[in-house]
């Protein structure tokens, strides 16, 4: 990906974009820094250039600020775009800036985007919300931030370029921040409580909720976070009717299975074909799985096929070709190798690991 849009004359745009945001240094978005200060002029003539900028990959300046982890420039953009549709613009992979922040595990960026009005239930091209992605890469702190009610916005704020539209005369006598009308705030307060809860039941295009994803990835801490947030512990995935308990058994994740059982998940849940979690556990080599289920009152299987069916082998996954959606982030990001997603960026990142 290229760098960020320039903040000046259009003729200079290519040079700015080719240089990459990372080369601008930590003061790039500070008053008087490269691209700001004198170039802003008396009005907002620079705004169409910045907020209209899109790379060949569909990334906006906001996407690039997140990818390059350039917080000063991110803060600058959010000062003008918070509460507007710009927050949820999607690139060619369907990713918003919030999706990218979750993939990168950048908690502070997730918090800022969330507080600025980024949509929680926007789906990227595989149907993943930001919470799905946080579950896929094990970004616990990001998930924790997303599982909180949205922070309230300030009640007093003047108009800005994005809030008022390009046809209105900008008010240049105020600090540039987004417009939050009282009517919008009242509506926001009514919906904020439900807003963050809706993502718990959001399904990706494989029919997996964030809890399904966390269970498949054997992530005990993530499952605990989702449980505490109120996720449905018995919701089946749509392909075969597997509950989170079935998925935990198929992943042979005894610690996840125990956590779900202690939290009240139904040990008698049945797949569409009638198989119970215990029936599935008896087909696995790990004896702890069946022991845990019996200890929590799981009924003994009756009349269940002793052979693994197509569903019980975890064949349902979203491990289809996801392209190189992580490549540019990894190349341009300053993240350490230990914080990258658990599989190479050029390979698909499956929700449903194949059984050993």
Curated annotation (Swiss-Prot):
Signal sequence, start to end: none
Region Disordered, annotated ranges: 149-193, 298-356
Tissue: Expressed in all tissues examined.
Biological function: Inhibits NF-kappa-B by complexing with and trapping it in the cytoplasm. However, the unphosphorylated form resynthesized after cell stimulation is able to bind NF-kappa-B allowing its transport to the nucleus and protecting it to further NFKBIA-dependent inactivation. Association with inhibitor kappa B-interacting NKIRAS1 and NKIRAS2 prevent its phosphorylation rendering it more resistant to degradation, explaining its slower degradation.
Compartments reported by the entry: Cytoplasm; Nucleus
Residue positions, PTM Phosphoserine: 19, 23, 183, 313, 315
Primary location class: cytoplasm
Compositionally biased intervals (Acidic residues): 183-193, 318-328
Top-rank lineage group of the source organism: Eukaryota
InterPro entries assigned: Ankyrin_rpt (IPR002110), Ankyrin_rpt-contain_sf (IPR036770)
Sequence ranges of the ANK repeats: 57-86, 93-122, 126-155, 206-235, 240-269, 273-302
Molecular function per GO: transcription coactivator activity
Name of the protein in its database record: NF-kappa-B inhibitor beta
């Amino acid at each position: 990906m290229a760098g960020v849009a320039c903040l000046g004359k259009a003729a200079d745009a290519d040079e700015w974009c080719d240089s990459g945001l990372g080369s601008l240094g930590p003061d790039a978005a500070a008053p008087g820094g490269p691209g700001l200060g004198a170039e802003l002029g008396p009005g907002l003539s620079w705004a169409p250039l910045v907020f209209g900028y899109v790379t060949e990959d569909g990334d906006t300046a906001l996407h690039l600020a997140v990818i390059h982890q350039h917080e000063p420039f991110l803060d600058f953009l959010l000062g003008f775009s918070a509460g507007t549709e710009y927050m949820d613009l999607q690139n060619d992979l369907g990713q918003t800036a919030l999706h990218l922040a979750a993939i990168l595990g950048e908690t502070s960026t997730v918090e800022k985007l969330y507080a600025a009005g980024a949509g929680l239930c926007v789906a990227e091209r595989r149907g993943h919300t930001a919470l799905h992605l946080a579950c896929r890469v094990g970004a616990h702190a990001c998930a924790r931030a997303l599982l909180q009610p949205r922070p309230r916005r300030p009640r007093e704020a003047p108009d800005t370029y994005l809030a008022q539209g390009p046809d209105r005369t900008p008010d240049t006598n105020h600090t540039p921040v987004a417009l939050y009308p009282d009517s919008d705030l009242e509506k926001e307060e009514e919906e904020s409580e439900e807003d963050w809860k809706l993502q718990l039941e959001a399904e990706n295009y494989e029919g997996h909720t964030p809890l399904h994803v966390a269970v498949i990835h054997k992530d005990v801490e993530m499952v605990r976070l989702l449980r505490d947030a109120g996720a449905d512990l018995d919701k089946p995935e749509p392909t075969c009717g597997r509950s989170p308990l079935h998925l935990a058994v198929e992943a042979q994740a005894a610690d996840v299975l125990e956590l779900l059982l202690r939290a009240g998940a139904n040990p008698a849940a049945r797949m569409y074909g009638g198989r119970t979690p215990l029936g599935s556990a008896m087909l696995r080599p790990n004896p702890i799985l069946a022991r845990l289920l019996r200890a929590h009152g799981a009924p003994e299987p009756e009349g269940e096929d002793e052979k693994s069916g197509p569903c019980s082998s975890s064949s349902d996954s979203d491990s289809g070709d996801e392209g190189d959606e992580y490549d540019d982030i990894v190349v341009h990001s300053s993240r350490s190798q230990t914080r990258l997603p658990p599989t190479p960026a050029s390979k698909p990142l499956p929700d449903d690991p194949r059984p050993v």
